[in-house]
From Swiss-Prot:
Organism phylogeny: Bacteria, Pseudomonadati, Pseudomonadota, Gammaproteobacteria, Enterobacterales
Organism: Salmonella enteritidis PT4 (strain P125109)
Protein name according to UniProt: Glutaminase
Keywords: Hydrolase
Hydrolase recorded as keyword: yes
Record-linked InterPro entries: Beta-lactam/transpept-like (IPR012338), Glutaminase (IPR015868)
Subunit annotation: Homotetramer.
Coiled coil regions, renumbered to chain: none
Length: 308
C-alpha cells in the first residue's frame, strides 16, 4: 500500500482528540447505555490484506447499536432479490432524526433508507419472513465475518431498549397500517433490539467490515460476503445516510462512507484499502461520536484519503 501506518500514529491521533472528551453526552434515553464510562476512546484498522493496527480502548467491547443496520441489510441481501428489498425501503438520505415519524407518515410508510430506524425495522421484518431464527443467524454471520466465536448480544441492553420501545413500536405500527410491515411487531422489535445490542470491539468491527473495502470479499473467508455491486451500493448508502442527519457534515470533514451508532462507535470504509472503527461514547447532538468523528478526520488528513 502507498501509505505507512503503525500503532504510534493512531496513539498520536487519540491524544489530539482526547481533549474533546467531556464536551459530548453519553446516550441516556437507553438506561443501559447511560452507565457507560464517557472517557473511553479507541481506534482500530483492518486492511484488505489482513494487517491490524490499534490504539486506546480498541479491544473493549461496547454496544454497536445502529452499526448493526449495515449487517442486517447484508443478511437481507443474501436472502432477497434486490427488487424486493428496494420496493419496501428507499435509498435516499432522510435529513430528519433517525426515529422520525413525520416523514414516514408523509411518505406512506416507505422509509427513506435502511439506516434509519424505520428502514432497519422493515429489513428486520423481511428477515423474520425468511429466517427460522433471525437472532442466531445474525450471530453466525458476525462471528464468521469477525473470526471470533464468542461475540454475543448484551441481554441487559436489549431488555432496556425493549422496555423503552414506545417510539420504535409506533414506527412499526405506522408502517403496518400502510401495509409495509408483515409480521408480529413485538417479535420483530425484539430481533431489532438484539441486533443493536451486539457487543463488539473496535478491532472486531474493523475486521468484520473489511469486506466492504474489498469489493465484498473478506480476506479470511472462502466465499464472497456480497457481490462487488452490492458492496458499492452499501458504501454509497453509508456515505449518504450512515451518519443520521449529519451525513453531509461528515462527508465534508472526513470524506468516507461510514455508519455510526449511539453506543459511540463508528465504522468507516476506505475502498480497496481498509476498514476503520472508532469508539468514544460521548455523542454530538445528532447522535454521532464527538471524539470519534474528530479521530477519523485526523486520520484521513494524515493518510490523505477521501472518496471525494
Amino acid at each position: 500500500m502507498a501509505w505507512a501506518m503503525d500503532n504510534a500514529i493512531l496513539e498520536t491521533i487519540l491524544q489530539r482528540v482526547r481533549p474533546l472528551i467531556g464536551q459530548g453526552k453519553v446516550a441516556d434515553y437507553i438506561p443501559a447505555l447511560a452507565s457507560v464510562e464517557g472517557s473511553k476512546l479507541g481506534i482500530a484498522i483492518c486492511t484488505v490484506d489482513g494487517q491490524h493496527y490499534q490504539a486506546g480502548d480498541a479491544h473493549e467491547r461496547f454496544s454497536i447499536q445502529s452499526i448493526s443496520k449495515v449487517l442486517s441489510l447484508v443478511v437481507a441481501m443474501r436472502h432477497y432479490p434486490e427488487e424486493e428489498i428496494w420496493q419496501r425501503v428507499g435509498k435516499d438520505p432522510s435529513g430528519s432524526p433517525f426515529n422520525s415519524l413525520v416523514q414516514l407518515e408523509m411518505e406512506q410508510g416507505i422509509p427513506r433508507n435502511p439506516f434509519i430506524n424505520a428502514g432497519a425495522l422493515v429489513v428486520c421484518d423481511m428477515l423474520q419472513g425468511r429466517l427460522s431464527a433471525p437472532r442466531q443467524r445474525m450471530l453466525e454471520v458476525v462471528r464468521a465475518l469477525c473470526g471470533v466465536s464468542d461475540i454475543t448480544y448484551d441481554a441487559t441492553v436489549a431488555r432496556s431498549e425493549f422496555e423503552h420501545s414506545a417510539r420504535n413500536a409506533a414506527i412499526a405500527w405506522l408502517m403496518k397500517s400502510f401495509g409495509n410491515f408483515h409480521h408480529d411487531v413485538p417479535t420483530v422489535l425484539q430481533n431489532y433490539f438484539h441486533y443493536c445490542a451486539l457487543k463488539m470491539s473496535c478491532m472486531e468491527l474493523a475486521r468484520t467490515f473489511v469486506f466492504l473495502a474489498n469489493q465484498g470479499e473478506a480476506f479470511h473467508l472462502d466465499e464472497p460476503v456480497v457481490t462487488p455491486m452490492q458492496a458499492r451500493q452499501i458504501n454509497a448508502l453509508m456515505a449518504t445516510s450512515g451518519m443520521y442527519q449529519n451525513a453531509g457534515e461528515f462527508a465534508w470533514r472526513v470524506g468516507l462512507p461510514a455508519k455510526s451508532g449511539v453506543g459511540g462507535g463508528i465504522v468507516a470504509i476506505v475502498p480497496h484499502e481498509m476498514a476503520i472503527a472508532v469508539w468514544s461514547p460521548e455523542l454530538d447532538p445528532a447522535g454521532n461520536s464527538l471524539a470519534g468523528i474528530a479521530a477519523l478526520e485526523q486520520l484521513t488528513q494524515t493518510l490523505g484519503r477521501s472518496v471525494y
